[in-house]
From Swiss-Prot:
Organism name: Rattus norvegicus (Rat)
InterPro entries: Nociceptin (IPR002367), Opioid_neupept (IPR006024)
Tissue expression summary: Expressed predominantly in the spinal cord and brain, being more abundant in the hypothalamus and striatum. Also found in small amounts in ovary.
GO CC terms in record: axon terminus; dendrite; extracellular region; neuronal cell body; plasma membrane; synaptic membrane
UniProt-listed PROSITE patterns: OPIOIDS_PRECURSOR
Post-translational modification note: Specific enzymatic cleavages at paired basic residues probably yield other active peptides besides nociceptin.
UniProt record similarity statement: Belongs to the opioid neuropeptide precursor family.
Region called Disordered, residue ranges: 103-125
Sequence repeat segments: 109-114, 115-120
UniProt biased composition (Acidic residues): 112-125
UniProt-recorded name of the protein: Prepronociceptin
Length: 181
């Protein structure tokens, strides 16, 4: 185990001394010939520069570059696809919440709509607000609050304007009636 660890360490040190990570990742991409969109070049570079750990994609690249042949052995395509899809899986972590949302939607659809009670509507509202909070739906609440504040501000402005215009018209009438105009 120590020998394997030392070999990997030596290989990573040599690769960082004699080459650059973007070139190595481009070479790796050419040698592996992955499906379009399955090879993430940025992730490979980050793994090469040891900024991301674990590094399944980069270890696959070092194996591919270490081999003299242009193609990998028949046993390695499984390893190739596993490493490539593992990097994609790390990008898809946010999709773990989808089953919870799906179950809420299915439960809501399963309820009979004809027998809807006000209590059920309130429960749906509470559930919807919780989902809205959990999945970042705050913008709608903020937007409506801003809209309401703008309406209040505008109505206050209009009220002041109307009061001033009424006072102004009353002054004109009184001045006109007194003959001061």
């Amino acid at each position: 185990m120590k020998i394997l660890f030392c070999d990997v360490l030596l290989l990573s040190l040599l690769s960082s001394v004699f080459s650059s990570c973007p070139e190595d990742c481009l070479t790796c991409q050419e040698r592996l010939h992955p499906a379009p969109g399955s090879f993430n070049l940025k992730l490979c570079i980050l793994q090469c520069e040891e900024k991301v750990f674990p590094r399944p994609l980069w270890t696959l690249c070092t194996k591919a570059m270490a081999s003299d042949s242009e193609q990998l052995s028949p046993a390695d395509p499984e390893l190739t696809s596993a490493a490539l899809y593992q990097s994609k899986a790390s990008e898809m972590q946010h999709l773990k919440r989808m089953p919870r949302v799906r179950s809420v939607v299915q439960a809501r659809d399963a309820e009979p709509e004809a027998d809807a009670e006000p209590v059920a509507d309130e429960a749906d509202e509470v559930e919807q607000k919780q989902l809205q909070k959990r999945f970042g739906g705050f913008t709608g609440a903020r937007k409506s609050a801003r809209k309401l504040a703008n309406q209040k501000r505008f109505s206050e402005f209009m009220r002041q304007y109307l009061v001033l215009s009424m006072q102004s018209s009353q002054r004109r009438r009184t001045l006109h009636q007194n003959g001061n105009v």
